[in-house]
């Protein structure tokens, strides 16, 4: 069992039960999945760029991502429907908790001029989105072996009904919000 998974059962659940006055343990919000998405627009001209992005994301997530394809053709961007233009991976279960642990304890503190994560990334339904500008904040990526700095979107999906519940859940996991 992942360290944060045990922490959730032992520390977070009792804290949120008390804070929100839930009647059942099953009402307590939990993280259901974490989705990593990387758009690689340069992949239109060079297929090697997408392969490198998939390699980076495989190292970060510990799971092979799927290539995302363009839904429709856009002449201005020189893309056709069906062209691979990015990659994404969905993490659940122990892998999700391991990634979240690395994100909170190792990766986010390595961001340059890091002062905390803005609380405006909630979507109104208890899910949180954040963007990372460069993949080198993760210790699995070696700075010398990357071809380009690429950002990614990290989407944390929870069972929380409101943003307040989701914020309390992530704060209980020591997520570094700005005050």
UniProtKB/Swiss-Prot annotation:
GO terms for cellular component: ribonucleoprotein complex; ribosome. Signal peptide: none annotated. The keyword Ribosomal protein applies. InterPro entries: Ribosomal_uL5, Ribosomal_uL5_bac-type, Ribosomal_uL5_C, Ribosomal_uL5_CS, Ribosomal_uL5_dom_sf, Ribosomal_uL5_N. Keywords: Ribonucleoprotein, Ribosomal protein, RNA-binding, rRNA-binding, tRNA-binding. The keyword Transcription does not apply. GO terms for molecular function: rRNA binding; structural constituent of ribosome; tRNA binding. One of its GO terms (biological process) is translation. Pfam families: Ribosomal_L5, Ribosomal_L5_C. Part of the 50S ribosomal subunit; part of the 5S rRNA/L5/L18/L25 subcomplex. Contacts the 5S rRNA and the P site tRNA. Forms a bridge to the 30S subunit in the 70S ribosome. This is one of the proteins that bind and probably mediate the attachment of the 5S RNA into the large ribosomal subunit, where it forms part of the central protuberance. In the 70S ribosome it contacts protein S13 of the 30S subunit (bridge B1b), connecting the 2 subunits; this bridge is implicated in subunit movement. Contacts the P site tRNA; the 5S rRNA and some of its associated proteins might help stabilize positioning of ribosome-bound tRNAs. NCBIfam families: PRK00010.1. Belongs to the universal ribosomal protein uL5 family. PANTHER family: 60S RIBOSOMAL PROTEIN L11-RELATED. This is Large ribosomal subunit protein uL5. It comes from Azoarcus sp. (strain BH72). The lineage of its organism: Bacteria, Pseudomonadati, Pseudomonadota, Betaproteobacteria, Rhodocyclales.
């Amino acid at each position: 069992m992942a360290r944060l998974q045990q922490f959730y059962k032992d520390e977070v659940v009792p804290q949120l039960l008390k804070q929100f006055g839930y009647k059942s343990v099953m009402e307590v919000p939990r993280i259901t999945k974490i989705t990593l998405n990387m758009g690689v627009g340069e992949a239109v001209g060079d297929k090697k760029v997408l392969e490198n992005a998939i390699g980076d994301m495989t190292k970060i997530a510990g799971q092979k991502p799927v290539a995302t394809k363009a839904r429709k053709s856009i002449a201005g961007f020189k893309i056709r429907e069906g062209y691979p233009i990015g990659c994404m991976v969905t993490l659940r279960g122990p892998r999700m908790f391991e990634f979240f642990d690395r994100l909170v304890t190792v990766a986010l503190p390595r961001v340059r001029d890091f002062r905390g994560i803005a609380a405006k990334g909630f979507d109104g339904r208890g899910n949180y989105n954040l963007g990372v500008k460069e993949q080198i904040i993760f210790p699995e990526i070696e700075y010398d072996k990357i071809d380009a700095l690429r950002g990614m979107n990290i989407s944390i999906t929870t069972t929380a009904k409101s943003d307040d519940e989701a914020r309390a859940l992530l704060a209980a996991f020591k997520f570094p919000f700005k005050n």
